[in-house]
Amino acid sequence: MSSEKEIQQQLSQMQGQGFDPEAQQRQEAQRQEANERRQGILIQILTPDARERLSRITIVKPEKSRQIEDLIIRAAQTGQLTERVDDAKLISLLEQLSEKTKKTTITMKRRTIEDDD
């Protein structure tokens, strides 16, 4: 009996601290719904080959895939896309994104100190 009381007490403390399981479930449901809408839009915009390529990119680099998806969806919503995005066009978009996000590398050459000992 006391363990049930302790559990209830801990649960009420967590809710008081901002931990609300129902709110988390609602947020998760909203995220899931938004993801389903996003996938539905991509299915309409991308050809099967382009979708397959994008799914392989998602496995390796999810952040790059997300950037490309955002770019494609934004272009479709603003009316910039007049036809479906095929594999060649997706490759072109990937190259453009790679050029924009190239990382600068800095090579440091350290001087060696000659010790007379």
From Swiss-Prot:
InterPro entries: PDCD5-like (IPR002836), PDCD5-like_sf (IPR036883). Residues 23-39 have a biased composition (Basic and acidic residues). GO terms for molecular function: DNA binding. It comes from the Eukaryota. Residues 8-22 have a biased composition (Low complexity). Pfam families: dsDNA_bind. Keywords: DNA-binding. Residues 1-40 are annotated as: Disordered. GO terms for cellular component: cytosol; nucleus. Belongs to the PDCD5 family. This is DNA-binding protein DDB_G0278111.
